[in-house]
Amino acid sequence: MKYVIIIPDGCADEAQEALGGRTPLEAAHTPAMDQVAADGIVLRANHTPAHLPPGSDIACMSLLGYNPLEYYTGRAPLEAAAQGIPLGPYDWAIRCNLVTIEDQVMRSFTAGQISSAEAAELMAAAQEKLGSERIRFYPGVGYRNLVIYRGNPEEPAPFSADTRTTPPHDLTDQSVLDHYPRGPGSDLLNQLMTDSIGVFAEHPVNLARQAAGKLPATNIWLWGLGQAPKLPRFADRFGLQGAMITAVDLLRGLGALLGWRRIDVPGATGYLDTDYAAKGRYAIQALQEVDLVCVHIEATDEASHEGHLEAKIQALEAIDQHIVGPIYQALQKLDPYRIMILPDHPTPLRLKTHAHGDVPVAMAGSDIRPDEAQRYDEPTAARSARYFPEGWKLMDFFLGRSA
């Protein structure tokens, strides 16, 4: 049996007045997704427990079959795993965004989609000016970077589970004054964030960006900290070998911790300009070597964060044409198979950030008896009697291990 999971990140949304009361999924031309729905079933799942933030880290952990209430320790440790950065028992990983803050308002949580090369230069400057034997700055992908705090038994890190931080993508166009880190260790985090302003102010990268009419990276924003999680390997838990295709370190890290093969796709950017067709091709190739392939696409989520309705629809249509369609055709030649399409969480355009709530799931393949669904969208899922309020249990159902 071959399995494919396709994750159009954050694609679940609300009805839009501009679309005559339809959601982006309803408005988009997605014949391949609709064919999966018609050939199989559409249902609902919830991957965002009410008392945890609706982050992709928590939601994707649940989506991949792991209870976040049991295994989740923070976002940054997952991204550290993606970069191959080892974490000892006293170490903490901290997500480090490069952001643009003007007049204490979060103008851009991506520093204007700063490039990885530019980010690497700024992170090197931060390491030189702010780093130490205990505090290390690590460049990642674009605006997504890391700080690692190296602790030891005699001098443990000052942080704890009570340290509170705010994701910068929750603050777009809002004041940041009430959202700085608080709790144990927050003084250190806030000092690093403040000190980075002086490091970046006259940096050549920012001067060049401003001269080109681009937003500068005014400072770092620290959040999502945690220690290394202890996740059972997917092969031990489910008996299958997997592979992950994504441009986002969070998903790469989850895949690494699960023991999955990492497949890097040329042209995969984690943004709206990603090479959708290449992701589809590489997924089909990977099916020859592993049992399960997971394809994650960030573009739909990024469009919502930016509040771009048309961009979200265009991303959905590109995913359908270049990823879902070719993969579904290839799978049918590899019978037996199963395919599942679902986002991790809703990212409503109205909010420009993640939200708790149900997501629509389309599933088809061997031994899946079709229901009456004809389309893949939120209203169709809402009418389904099948519901997984504990979304991490959905994986057992998808793999045919539960009814």
Residue ranges, per PLM feature:
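Feature captures the catalytic ectodomains and active-site-proximal regions of enzymes
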Residues: 1-403
